[in-house]
């Protein structure tokens, strides 16, 4: 971290309890400055020579007699940065050594501006020195710029607003730079896809800046992302990755417990910042945001916007992404997906997704039959390379709902095309006592056709085996497919 030292004298400031500060020298106190519950016992000359504000507000004695008996008292509790920033300004006036760094420079700069410690009253005054430090050092440092920006959130002054703009400009400019020119340190701890270990020859990743900005409060983060987007040099998918990293940092795991601890405005802000283009946000992240918007009771327009975004990338979604949804919501997503007139390959992916979802949801003995049928029938026209996972869902439903009638069981099994079961699935089905006898006969019939085709030299193309990875992934006969 960069820093700047001002002054050469040793520290002669002492404290009396928590609320009194004074300077040790032979001169008597001439002025008391009150800031909140803290009182500073000081001398006029060092202050008046550098502060226009104090010159205006401290009375001067008319004669020596009055001067001996008079102690001016002034309350400036409204000073930005409070007593800590004011004490640094005072020490500067006394020539006492002070150290400025990214953590305190903004507060001191605002306090100095409040006290009018500018060039009008003394050349190279405190405001000037701080501005030189900011421009030559702080705003040229990536991490210091972020720290400085973070410290502005508790300061309410026109001067702090100007500093925020300068910080944002520095951060946006640095984040937008060509990665080949990035020579400074940055934080990069996220796992990359396929557990790829980055090598020096890989160069600096495009999203190198993402994690450092996660330290910012949401209001400042919003301004930083907008400033970066306005530069127009950072790809939308990197912006999406930045928002994902920030959300994960603030909402651990997107669990109900973690979401109970956050404010709705956090989710609303992240949603507002999402890139509009399809594919720049992962489907997994979109589903997490959508679930969070439902859980937190966000506005309907927000929830509908996210539902549409999820449906647009439904073919990229995994079963784990949608397991937290109820069947009505998943059916709504499927219908939204169908309204886009999707291509065949997308339909195949979504059919596989929903089959896997039903296989998991069927484990719930309280799942209504009509809900199961309604969702499954919504995709009845979708092409599937294999009906293995659909069979798995049907078998699990029959296992957990053994009390349904024969006609209901027949309707459930009617969802499946026995011709599209793999050999392993057929082997399981013919031994499955939960299936109606008619279905077992159909399976045996098509297996016979398959066997006859093999004996005559014609073989049916092997169907793709589809397995959903779950903790309880075994059939009753301890066979997987």
Swiss-Prot record:
One GO term (biological process): protein ubiquitination
Top-level taxon of origin: Eukaryota
Keywords noted in UniProt: Cell membrane, Cytoplasm, Membrane, Phosphoprotein, Ubl conjugation pathway
Pfam family, one: NPH3
Composition skew (Low complexity), residue ranges: 460-469
Record PTM Phosphotyrosine, positions in chain: 391
Disruption phenotype: Plants lacking NPY2/MEL3, NPY3/MEL2, NPY4/MEL4 and NPY5/MEL1 exhibit severe reduction in PIN proteins (e.g. PIN1 and PIN2) abundance which are less phosphorylated and lacking polar localization in the root endodermal cell layer and in shoot epidermis due to increased clathrin-dependent internalization from the plasma membrane; this leads to defective expression of auxin responsive genes, defects in cotyledons and floral organs formation, as well as impaired root gravitropic responses.
Region (Disordered): 456-481
Chief site of localization: membrane
Pathway involvement of the protein, from the record: Protein modification; protein ubiquitination
Annotated ranges, domain NPH3: 207-450
Family the entry assigns: Belongs to the NPH3 family.
Entry's free-text remark on domains: The BTB/POZ domain mediates the interaction with some component of ubiquitin ligase complexes.
Name of the protein described by the UniProt record: Phototropic-responsive NPH3 family protein NPY4
């Amino acid at each position: 971290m960069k820093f700047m030292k001002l002054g050469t004298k040793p520290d002669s400031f002492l404290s009396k309890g928590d609320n009194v500060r004074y300077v040790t020298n032979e001169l008597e106190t001439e002025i008391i400055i009150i800031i909140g519950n803290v009182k500073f016992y000081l001398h006029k000359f060092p202050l008046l020579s550098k502060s226009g504000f104090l010159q205006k507000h401290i009375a001067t004695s008319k004669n020596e007699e009055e001067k001996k008996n008079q102690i001016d008292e002034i309350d400036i509790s409204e000073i930005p940065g409070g007593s800590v920033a004011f004490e640094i300004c005072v020490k500067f006036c006394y020539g006492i050594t002070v150290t400025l760094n990214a953590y305190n420079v903004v507060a001191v700069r605002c306090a100095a501006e409040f006290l009018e410690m500018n060039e009008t009253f003394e050349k190279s005054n405190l405001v000037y020195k701080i501005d030189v430090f900011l421009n030559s050092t702080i705003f040229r440092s990536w991490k210091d710029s972020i720290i400085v920006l973070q410290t502005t959130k508790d300061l309410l002054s026109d001067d702090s607003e100007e500093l925020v703009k300068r910080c944002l400009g520095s951060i946006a400019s640095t984040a937008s730079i060509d990665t080949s020119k990035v020579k400074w340190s940055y934080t990069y701890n996220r796992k990359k896809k396929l557990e790829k270990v980055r090598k020096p020859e890989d160069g600096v990743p495009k999203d190198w800046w993402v994690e450092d900005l996660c330290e910012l409060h949401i209001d400042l983060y919003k301004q930083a992302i907008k400033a970066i987007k306005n530069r127009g040099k950072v790809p939308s998918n990197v912006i999406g990755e930045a928002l994902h990293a920030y959300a994960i940092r603030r909402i651990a795991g997107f669990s109900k417990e973690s979401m109970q601890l956050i404010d709705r405005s956090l989710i609303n802000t992240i949603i507002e910042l999402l890139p509009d283009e399809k594919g720049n946000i992962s489907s997994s992240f979109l589903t997490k945001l959508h679930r969070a918007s439902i859980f937190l009771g966000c506005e309907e327009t927000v929830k509908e916007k996210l539902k549409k975004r999820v449906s647009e990338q439904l073919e990229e979604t995994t079963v784990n992404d949608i397991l937290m949804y109820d069947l009505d919501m998943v059916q709504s997503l499927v219908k939204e997906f169908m309204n886009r007139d999707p291509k065949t390959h997308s339909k195949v992916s979504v059919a596989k997704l929903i089959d896997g979802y039903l296989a998991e949801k069927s484990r719930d003995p309280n799942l209504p039959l009509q809900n199961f049928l309604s969702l499954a029938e919504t995709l009845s026209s979708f092409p599937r390379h294999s009906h293995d996972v659909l069979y798995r869902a049907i078998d699990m439903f029959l296992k957990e709902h053994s009390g349904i009638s024969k006609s209901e069981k027949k309707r459930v099994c009617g969802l499946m095309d026995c011709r599209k079961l793999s050999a392993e699935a057929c082997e399981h089905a013919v031994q499955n006592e939960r299936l109606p006898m008619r279905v077992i006969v159909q399976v045996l019939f098509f297996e016979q056709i398959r066997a006859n085709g093999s004996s005559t030299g014609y073989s049916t193309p092997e169907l793709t085996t589809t397995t959903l990875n779950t903790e309880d992934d075994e059939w009753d006969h301890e066979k997987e497919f």
